[in-house]
Design a protein with these regions (language model features):
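Histidine/acidic-rich helix-loop-helix segments that form or flank divalent-metal centers
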Residues: 2, 59-63, 109-147
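Short alpha-helical hairpin
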Residues: 2-20
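Alpha-helical phosphate/pyrophosphate-handling elements in metalloenzyme active cores
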Residues: 25-59
């Protein structure tokens, strides 16, 4: 029986710290961030769908949010100011992220990989869904900053 270490590798998310360059009241793991982003993404999509009548898939976006930073298991968390410093650097990091997502997908059986690749790459999402996921990601960061501001670490 062949072993597929995909889930074992994703289990490492709980040990990968985010926000390495910022003070924090407590360390936030990649696992916590992805759960927060998934909850926020699902809620934003439900609002978009039910109130504004958009054709988005809340469940698909929520699952994609669970994997949206999975490549950081292999790459680490690059600070946002560095990631967006210049277009060549941003493009290079996007290529590194895409390669890491491909590497993660390769840890699955072929039959499963076909259904997972779109979540790992974000390719399963429409442009509107991608925007909502990005908004959820940013809301998660804003909430983290608000909590930091109101904590003893501020």
């Amino acid at each position: 029986m062949e072993l597929y270490p995909f889930n074992a590798l994703l289990a490492r998310m709980k040990y990968i710290a985010r926000w390495g360059l910022m003070r924090a009241a407590r360390t936030e793991s990649l696992s916590e961030h992805t759960a927060d982003a998934a909850i926020l993404a699902h809620t934003l999509c439900l609002v978009s769908q039910t109130i504004f009548g958009t054709d988005v898939r809340p469940e698909t976006v929520a699952v994609a949010a669970l994997y949206h930073d999975a490549s950081e298991i292999l790459t680490g968390d690059m600070p946002t100011p560095v990631k967006y410093k210049s277009e060549p650097l941003r493009a290079a990091y996007k290529a590194v992220e895409a390669d890491a997502a491909h590497t993660l997908g390769a840890l699955l059986p072929d039959a499963v990989r076909a259904g997972m690749d779109g979540y790992l790459s974000g390719g399963i999402l429409t442009q509107k869904e991608r925007q909502l996921l990005k908004a959820a990601d940013r809301l998660s960061a804003l909430i983290k900053c608000c909590l930091l501001y109101t904590s003893d670490a501020a």
